[in-house]
Regions:
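ABC ATPase nucleotide-binding domain helical subdomain, centered on the C-loop/LSGGQ "ABC signature"
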Residues: 1, 9, 16, 34-75, ...
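ABC-fold ATPase nucleotide-binding domain signature/coupling loops
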Residues: 3, 59-88, 106, 110-113, ...
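ABC ATPase nucleotide-binding domain signature
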Residues: 18-27, 41, 76-77, 139
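C-terminal portion of ABC ATPase nucleotide-binding domains
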Residues: 55, 64, 120-129, 143-186
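ABC ATPase nucleotide-binding domain "signature" region
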Residues: 81-82, 88-93, 117, 134
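A short, proline-enriched helix->beta-strand linker immediately N-terminal to the Walker B motif
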Residues: 95-99
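Catalytic Walker B motif of ABC-type/P-loop ATPase nucleotide-binding domains
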Residues: 101-105
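Conserved H-loop
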Residues: 129-135
């Protein structure tokens, strides 16, 4: 089911327009930053693009370029670091305004402060109903989710909120402790 309709009732194009992906290994296209952002929403205004770039914590970099949104993106985004590419593809996903946002280790190449700011921006994507599916090895990326599924060897070993899993899942506790624990939970 997707909403109140059977997923089989949707065409592939309809599903593609409803779902946005941000993968750990992301894709930037040869062209300009603006052209790359328009892949998310070809009707987006410059104002909307700048807002998405701001939410994705990449706006200061873009504003540092003389040609701003018209800055050239080389093949495979080779003129950007891994973290910069991730933030640009996150901005593109924000522009799409999809009903389902799938983030697969999408902040793995950014520092913890940037990750936290992006997570805060993701949590405020409420202009329209949105389901967020976050796949991550970092607990800090998923700790605020309504439902967390813990996998080991491809099998579900635990499920619940962060608080539930800290109390009841040894594997989750081990991962949590190995990543430094706490995460400003005080």
């Amino acid at each position: 089911m997707l909403g109140e309709h059977n997923i089989k009732d949707y065409t592939l194009d309809a599903l593609n327009s409803y779902i946005s992906f941000v993968l750990q290994k992301n894709t930037l296209f040869t062209g300009t930053i603006r052209e790359n952002m328009l892949w998310g929403n070809n009707n987006a205004t410059d104002e909307e693009i700048y807002e998405a770039l701001k939410k994705a914590e990449i706006l200061p970099l873009i504003e540092s370029y003389k040609d701003k949104l018209d800055h050239e993106v080389l093949i495979d985004g080779k003129n950007f670091s891994g973290g910069q590419k991730q933030r640009l593809t996150i901005a593109r996903a924000f522009l799409k305004k999809a009903g389902i946002l799938i983030l697969d280790d999408s902040t793995s190449a950014v520092d913890k402060i940037t990750e936290k700011n992006i997570q805060n921006a993701i949590s405020t994507l409420s202009e329209h109903p949105i389901t967020k599916i976050i796949i991550s090895q970092r607990i800090s990326s998923v700790k605020d989710c309504d439902n967390i599924i813990v996998l080991e060897d491809g099998k579900i070993t635990a499920q619940g909120t962060h608080k539930d899993l800290i109390a009841n899942s040894l594997l989750y506790q081990e991962i949590y402790n190995s990543q430094g624990g706490d995460y400003n939970e005080k």
